[in-house]
């Protein structure tokens, strides 16, 4: 039996990292500082990609490793794939 895993790196993160390929509709169990929750995946998620573990409003930070890694360009629901199609970077050109 294949064991599929996700990792929440820091308590303040609003995204998980997928350590397996997942299909939409699968359920992942997540340990949060507020208690364990189950998240139903709304999208197919490839190994190494991010999954929203909390609702993220458009313009809000994407937090991984306890640090902001970008901002949501649209609302992201719990269980959605978080990637370049719904995240913008915070880098500014000089």
Set out the residue ranges of the language-model regions.
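N-terminal small-residue-enriched
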Residues: 2-94
